[in-house]
Amino acid sequence: MRFEGTSAYVATDDLKVAVNAAITLERPLLVKGEPGTGKTVLALEIAKALNAPLIEWHVKSTTKALQGLYEYDAVSRLRDSQLGDERVKDIRNYIRRGKLWDAFVADERPVLLIDEIDKADIEFPNDLLQELDRMEFFIYETGEVVQARRRPIVVITSNNEKELPDAFLRRCFFH
């Protein structure tokens, strides 16, 4: 698995080295730069070039790290319990998978894009450290552990709107 660019995306030698090092060493690739410089498109082109599925997680200022893992809908469960709905007996009916969960259980090794990570609050990157390192996470409501079948190729973009934590940066290749 090597990325050499595509007909639609001409990559510099430095970028090719960074992408291939991140893939080979199974570490996230952090791509920093101004808006509109092709950072997001890079993940799409890596997926195309490697014939891999692309899973996109577009981060907003209100995004929390847990949303990338899963979301538990306690309000719907409470409402259903008051209405006597049978679904309430299985808490799994109220858990929605996040983008990391989708990437962890994908049949083929996917490219996971975490787009514009610097839009979220300062703790967001640190909140993902363990999950990205260990490639697993715990679902508190069910007591289950979700483990990655295979480590996804992780591409993280940043517009340099704010500094990212050092502990997070140490775990990434960057370009």
What are these regions, as identified by a protein language model?
Residues 94-95, 101-109, 139-157:
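AAA+/SF3 P-loop NTPase mechanochemical coupling elements
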Residues 52-56, 165-175:
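A short helix-turn-beta junction within AAA+ P-loop NTPase domains corresponding to the substrate/partner-engaging
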Residues 69-107:
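Short glycine-rich substrate-engagement loop in P-loop NTPases that contacts/grips substrate
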Residues 1-16:
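Dynamic helix-loop-helix/coil hinge segments at AAA+ ATPase domain boundaries and subdomain interfaces
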Residues 29-75:
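Walker A/P-loop
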Residues 97-132, 163-164:
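Conserved AAA+/SF3 P-loop NTPase catalytic/coupling segment centered on the Walker-B
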Residues 117, 134-150, 161-167:
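Conserved Walker
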Residues 11-13, 20-26, 34, 103-107:
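Phosphate-binding P-loop
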